[in-house]
């Protein structure tokens, strides 16, 4: 049984009433709190921190970093969760697991299912425009300024604006040896590009797979693009706290000097560890579902809001509760045996039904058969008088 309550219910004059929350949990026999992104607003965050401090069981729910992925985390959220700790995933894989993981990675790279909408692949265009012999290419994918992981998991001097300033200064220092390609996040507001004269801002429609393929190294705060860099065997330098940041997988810069030192080094990652991490996310941590989005604008930024998820895999506390291969809806011709119980409805011959059958093809009827208006219309037309 699920009971929902807005965060405001537990606040009086903007002050969190802890006793009211505890009483509510007790009165309704609630033994676990579900948080959709506990950092989503300040009130929810206060409740989340209180729940953690009081050892109240909870589940954090949000989108994952792989295509179609979502997580139900009973330990924390994103970087603050211990479920990403290395002891959970750095385990030996057998040959079949390695092969399966590589095939999954190839399906991501060759596919067209991304966290954010991407343009068509056009690697040669990008290469012809920016490739220069003996120069390293640095790809910098930007994030939304007000995103949770920017607001809560960054540090000075690498806040959002400070990051761009440092990247611009670093690009000037390395102008003889490096080319910096920067891509704005599709949901971000406009950037004063003229302020960053040492950076090349590539088209917003550039596919990230092309950009990662072309570059020698990725530099980001804590973008999920860093995970794509890993699976494509490209070193990634994080300038903020990221849930996927571990020795051997990527590199972390805490200041501009460290960033510069990394960029002039020959960075390599341990791809065997990458496979272990991806295997863990895919098979032991993430749930998967096809999501349906609508774009909205609020508080000065664009949002992609999910209004429906068709789950085909659900994992909670390392247990799989659902795992199906196909969630595509199937349409049947009205002559199918599946409609045998409804023969009277299908063959009752009044003038309205004849018109209905004549004007509307079977495949259209099949597509709309689950809608409420269709059921009402059937009732009117087919019910015996």
Annotate each predicted stretch with a short phrase.
Residues 97-109, 306-385:
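Membrane-proximal basic amphipathic "stem/tether" segments
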Residues 225-295:
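Catalytic binding pocket for nucleotide-activated donors in carbohydrate/polymer assembly enzymes
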Residues 32-45, 204-251:
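A donor-sugar binding/catalytic signature common to diverse glycosyltransferases
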Residues 107-152, 156:
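Active-site cores of enzymes that catalyze phosphoryl transfer or operate on phosphate-rich substrates
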Residues 2, 164-203:
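Catalytic donor nucleotide-activated moiety binding site of glycosyltransferases and closely related
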Residues 2-85:
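Active-site and donor-binding regions of nucleotide-sugar-utilizing enzymes
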Residues 1, 63, 135-149, 184-185, ...:
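Short loop/turn segments at strand-loop or loop-helix junctions that form parts
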Residues 52-123, 265, 269:
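Active-site-proximal region of nucleotide-activated glycan assembly enzymes
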